[in-house]
Amino acid sequence: ENAGCWSATGASAEAENQKFTDGQDAGKLTAGLMWQTVKRYSCKYKLESEITSFVALDDNVEVMYVRIHNVAKTDQKITPVAAVPIYGRSADNIRDHRNVTSMLHRICTQQYGITVKPTMSFDEKGHRRNHLIYFVAGAAGCGVKPCSFYPTVEAFVGEGGTFTHPEAVYREKDGMPAGVEIAGKEAMGGIRFEQVTLKPDETMKYVIIMGIAEQEDEVEKLVAKYDSAAKAKQALETVKNYWQEKVNVRYHTGDSRFDLFMRWVSFQPFLRRLYGCSFLPHHDYGRGGRGWRDLWQDCLSLLLMDPGDVRQMVVSNYGGVRIDGTNATIIGSKLGEFIADRNGISRVWMDHAVWPFMTTKLYLDQTGDVEILLEKAKYFKDAQAGRGTDIDDAWTDEYGMWQRTAGGDVYEGTILEHLLVEHLCAFYEVGKHNEMRLRGADWNDALDMAADNGESVAFTCAYAGNLRQLADCLRLMQDKIACTEIELLEEISILLEDNTKRYEDIAAKQALLKKYTSTCRHDISGKKIQVSFDSLIENLTHKADWIMEHIRRTEWPQGQDNEGWFNSYYDNHENAVEGISEQGVRMMLTGQVFAIMSGTATDEQIGQICKSADHYLYDAAVGGYRLNTDFCELKFDMGRMFGFAYGEKENGAVFSHMTVMYANALYKRGFVK
């Protein structure tokens, strides 16, 4: 009282002004799995705050447990105000229809807080009635209700004010009571508590609850579960214990800081399953969804930490594979849910078929469960056909998003069949140099400007390695289940041609793939054929061997002083991307990693790759191996990565996962001392 206004979170104009000066608040962050505590100390106001934020386990709420401590030697009167803006709509509306969508808001002050229920949501797809309720509520530590509220931005900020310098706080304006209804305004979770007197060394506690619900009574029940300090502390302990148990991998490397960092890395896949790829609605991958690779890479980590549900996840994820070997790119929120892209032909990433087998192979190695390859899964179906080169005009919403037979039945094939479709279609989709076409991009999303003529040697290596390992799995399967034949869709016989002359003939390979995709353009026969294990193993092995020998023979730029490496790509002008030219040495790490990992690189070549990578890519100053050398060119015939500053993102940065894969590849091949 009469001393000023202090932000316990540091979100005030005064706090901003004091940054980097002697008057700046002292602060300390302590973070754990799904919770964090921030302490602040104000020398000026002689107050200390401790704010613990956590996400509840079973409820759609985030809770802030706040402690305000008087460190002065005299009594202090304080009036606590909590302020959380309630945006209450899609992140898209930050740019589109921001003002108009605020007019949809129906705001109400309740006993403990503010609720906002927009009447509807709308965009270019249409109008939808809204059922969600956004709310911010609060209580004193003993459970006492707030005394008043600031339910709109206008009421809180005031004319000319800001969130960091609000009129309601600085002029101590009275709030509104419970029971007030307001329509068509930007909403604010402004909560004012009764003034209290803090004696020296005394602490007051408060709880702020933020959440989303579908029913009014659900809001009341949620608030009642957390409306006191005791309830909030108990919920916090539950959260801490749960996630400590869930993230159950521990690391002991001799470097305790690194060990703790790896615990956070282990936690990240859980965050991605819950929140998607981004937690910031307007930063980078702001839509926050998960992609095809995320599904499979999350399974990899969960195999170590939460293996119980992984089998069903793996089987369900195969339902995203199309009969032409491509896959759905819009992932639903439920297990095995995939959504059709109705905006025309969607982008095809040529690496997408690599990851399902890599994940399944780790699952097999961990469990010995080869029977999973005989589990049945559906195939995804939408209007996209011909591996993203055609539209199936006969497909409709009524057809549904599962591949059907000519008789109208939803077709199911084994996981093994899905893997064969993915890899065999990729085998035949080649460019001018008989390497697999790059299409929209591969693992490196920024190689996105060579869709017509680009080729990815790097991932051609990866597919070859997968084909060879899939043959190994079939041998294991043959021994374990005592079976001599496998059942496959009749149309797949087209892809099972085993003819070396065909492999060398680019046009013939492309024609064979066209024949298959045309046959499967809309419906499939549903008829089955029996294929012997021995012939299938031989078929896959021949294809893998041919790819590897072809790459060894045609994609090796030989350097000086026993240096050499594999060319990783061809650009849209059909030129090799790597090698030695007038512009200097051009080398990329990706092609080396997959050549080594797949078995394409010979031991002699690995030695030369290591020497070249150490020479051209390793940079101790940035912490490891760069993704590529500096091409000193924009390369509009390859991808946007060359527009990034060198050393940023895909253009020459140290990509931790690729350097880890490089280490793993060397380890697998016996090159780690």
Language model features: what each stretch is:
Residues 1, 319-328, 380-389, 487-502, ...:
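Short, mixed-charge aromatic SLiMs
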Residues 1-296, 305-320, 332-333, 346-370, ...:
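Anionic coordination/interaction segments
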Residues 97, 220-221, 330-331, 370-381, ...:
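Short, glycine/acidic-rich hinge or "gate" loops at secondary-structure transitions
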Residues 193, 217, 237-256, 261, ...:
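Long, charged, mostly alpha-helical binding arms that flank functional sites
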Residues 295, 302-310, 314-432, 457-467, ...:
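Aromatic-rich carbohydrate-recognition surfaces in CAZymes
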Residues 328-341, 388-403, 494-512, 556, ...:
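Charged/polar, low-hydrophobicity segments characteristic of intrinsically disordered regions
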Residues 543-557:
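Metal-assisted phosphate- and nucleotidyl-transfer catalytic regions
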